[in-house]
């Protein structure tokens, strides 16, 4: 279930402040954040945001298609290695 339209999209204030500061200065350095729950706003376009996945910060370059999605959608937290293969040696 999505967020109520009357509330509007959510983004952490500290992340918005970092992006606004970078936009004013005109620099494109990597912005490190732990806020996976923040919605991507149009002001984020063109910035690289390092989103924490529980182990490391994953760099996410924000494009126009990402607006409206959450930052956490682009930094997966689980790595799937695959199921065990057919080990015919052990079945003998």
From Swiss-Prot:
Keywords: Ribonucleoprotein, Ribosomal protein, RNA-binding, rRNA-binding. Pfam families: Ribosomal_S19. The keyword ATP-binding does not apply. One of its GO terms (molecular function) is rRNA binding. Signal peptide: none annotated. GO terms for cellular component: cytoplasm; small ribosomal subunit. InterPro entries: Ribosomal_uS19 (IPR002222), Ribosomal_uS19_bac-type (IPR005732), Ribosomal_uS19_CS (IPR020934), Ribosomal_uS19_SF (IPR023575). NCBIfam families: rpsS_bact. Protein S19 forms a complex with S13 that binds strongly to the 16S ribosomal RNA. This is Small ribosomal subunit protein uS19. It comes from Exiguobacterium sibiricum (strain DSM 17290 / CCUG 55495 / CIP 109462 / JCM 13490 / 255-15). The gene is rpsS.
